[in-house]
């Protein structure tokens, strides 16, 4: 269960926020040092630690759902590339996967990833490549039917070349979209991370053929200097 922030500073350094500065160690690239310094000073990283979430990405799906309301009690959700499980921590209580909301429908959460994921009550994690032949049928079998939501925070390994990374993640996102077409219930929702860079127009065209509404959203918790956005497609036509 996520811990509630106490509002107290227990660092012993007084009651004001401190900016952490990281020295560049011998053998460490300057870019790595900058990333580490940004990570240590990121308010969402600090908040995730305080509230018991597995990563800052939890706030992204939280903010998207606050706006579009797709994680509702009784929803059957598939999370592609679910590690480390931060999105699951947000989704499980919202879809009532544990049945804690009396009188509300009980949802199902299936997370799949190439790596093993630490267990979480109310979530069902499986090691599976969603691009494998028959993966869609396997997921539907686990769900006991079609999904109401397919969501993805996946990103291809960074090459250090912006345009290459953009094309890689767009290819991954398009593959996830085709997976969603196979497993979504009519009226369902597809949510996926994209990187701006020019090729996202083709994905938009594809999704507009299959969904009633398609939006590009940059949630507040996405870093301002990042090209990251999320596509939220609602009203799957089947």
UniProtKB/Swiss-Prot annotation:
Keywords: Cytoplasm, Methyltransferase, rRNA processing, S-adenosyl-L-methionine, Transferase. Belongs to the class I-like SAM-binding methyltransferase superfamily. RNA methyltransferase RlmE family. Its main location: cytoplasm. The active site is at 193 (proton acceptor). GO terms for cellular component: cytoplasm. It comes from Ruegeria sp. (strain TM1040) (Silicibacter sp.). HAMAP family: RNA_methyltr_E. Pfam families: FtsJ (PF01728). It is an enzyme of class 2 (transferase). This is Ribosomal RNA large subunit methyltransferase E. Specifically methylates the uridine in position 2552 of 23S rRNA at the 2'-O position of the ribose in the fully assembled 50S ribosomal subunit. It comes from the Bacteria. SUPFAM superfamilies: S-adenosyl-L-methionine-dependent methyltransferases.
